[in-house]
A protein has these predicted regions:
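Short Gly/Ser/Thr- and Asp/Glu-enriched loop/turn motifs at secondary-structure junctions
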Residues: 103-104, 349-356, 380-385
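Conserved PLP-enzyme active-site core in the AAT-like
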Residues: 108-285
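Conserved PLP-binding catalytic core of the aspartate aminotransferase-like
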Residues: 345-371
Length: 411
């Protein structure tokens, strides 16, 4: 790893203190033009002793605004400290995890995977409009039926049709013949420009799509397309556990990627990440935001600099090898759990590089599912699956109690 290092507690604190020192202190400064201030001292303790012992809490009190996309260069000078740490986060994720070339990427910390996925669709819609003078009716989004519901939100907001591709019930793999037939039909109906959401660990199954399947068929039909990888859940696991993965920026078919720090990285909510190749994010430049230094190319505008510092702090507390050890532990627990299910002849789906196990509902009584907090595929109608996720708090002791309940039920 070129940039992803493990820092001591002292170095982490020093870097964060330096970042905050180079960010305007609205407690003491008299800047008149910013609609910004520190947190309200009548409500929040802005001078407590605990702040000196917690650089992250100090960041939240300082309340920096990371508006803009800092990989492009110019940004709001008032918040340059927290922006610099965000740039380091994007650098680690783009270069070290997703194998982008130096300075050939852009990105920012979004509010979550939903925003990051919608950012990608927004970029590609505008790109097709600018480059090909495409109409909304000529564009279409392709995504598997297991894709996160954010694609439907994006489709609705951007007014671009989304078409779901069927997957095999047991393997959760995209039905290639159906994909080919659907693309043929869409072209015949007048669709000319295709946006793809390809999954790196679906929310329900942890299943991973092969983006090259989409690329091969779309290339065969000679239509322009862009592929976005939704790695909201899998982005901090799959590239670590599967070192042979080609779902990264070395793959020319991949144009952008979503990752969520507030899932596996256990960062505060509001810490999704959007990454893309250079030359794409400019398609959503908001020219009217002229009072923002460096302009704005993000969907939400103002963003928490403290959240960016939180993600930076977690990444550099672990370093690559510390994170590898953590993921390896979770995968060992997952393998142990799967072995118990095999002994009980319980049918389930699991991608071998992921920590999600999704069990067919016929093997799980509703009272057991409720007792252990299993998540169903649907709360409405005929549910066919329940999922178990080996997060950090889910230990083998917890899993063994669940297994014993299942054993009693099956006997």
């Amino acid at each position: 790893m070129k940039y992803w290092k493990k820092y001591t507690r002292e170095k982490l604190t020093k870097r964060i203190d330096e970042a905050l020192e180079s960010t305007i202190d609205f407690q003491s400064s008299k800047y008149l033009g910013y609609p910004v201030s520190k947190l309200d001292e009548n409500v929040f303790n802005t001078n407590g002793k605990i702040l000196s012992e917690s650089p992250l809490l100090k960041s939240y009190i300082a309340n920096p605004n990371n508006i803009g996309c800092h990989t492009l260069g110019k940004s709001e000078e008032a918040f340059k400290g927290s922006q610099e740490l965000e740039k380091e986060v994007i650098q680690v994720l783009a270069v070290d995890i997703f194998k982008a070339e130096e300075n050939e990427y852009d990105g920012y910390i979004a509010t979550g995977g939903t925003e990051a996925n919608m950012q990608a669709l927004w970029i590609y819609r505008n790109l097709f409009k600018k480059k090909y003078h495409a109409t909304l009716e000529e564009m279409v989004i392709l995504s598997s039926e297991d894709t996160h519901y954010s694609v439907h939100k994006g489709s609705n907001i951007l007014n671009v049709e989304n078409v779901s591709i069927p997957v095999d019930f047991d393997s959760r793999e995209i039905n290639i013949e159906a994909l080919d037939a659907i693309i043929k039909k869409l072209i015949k109906e007048g669709k000319k420009y295709f946006m793809v959401i390809s999954n790196m660990a679906t929310t329900m199954f942890g299943s991973v799509d092969n983006p090259d399947i989409y690329a091969e068929i779309l290339t065969k039909h000679n239509v322009p397309f862009k592929i976005h990888v939704d790695g909201a859940f899998g982005g901090f696991i799959y590239p670590i556990s599967n070192r042979q993965s080609t779902i990264n920026f070395e793959n020319p078919n991949v144009s952008s990627i979503t990752i969520d720090a507030h899932k596996m990285l256990q960062a505060p909510y509001g810490t999704g990440v959007f990454l893309c190749r250079k030359g794409l994010i400019e398609n959503v430049l908001t020219k009217e935001a002229q009072y923002v230094d460096g302009m704005d190319l993000t969907m939400v505008g103002s963003r928490s600099g403290a959240n960016a510092i939180a993600v930076w702090m977690i990444l550099f507390s672990y370093g690559y090898y510390g994170w590898f050890e953590k993921i390896s532990t979770l995968l060992l627990r997952t393998e142990w759990f799967c072995a118990q299910l095999n002994d009980l002849n319980i049918a389930y789906y699991r991608n071998p590089f992921m920590n999600i196990v999704t069990i067919k509902s016929e093997f799980i009584p509703e009272n057991i599912a409720y007792k252990f907090g299993l998540v169903p595929e649907t709360h409405e109608g005929d549910n066919k699956w329940y999922k178990v996720i080996m997060m950090s708090h889910v230990e083998i002791d917890d899993l063994s109690k669940f297994v014993e309940e299942l054993r009693t039920h099956t006997n």
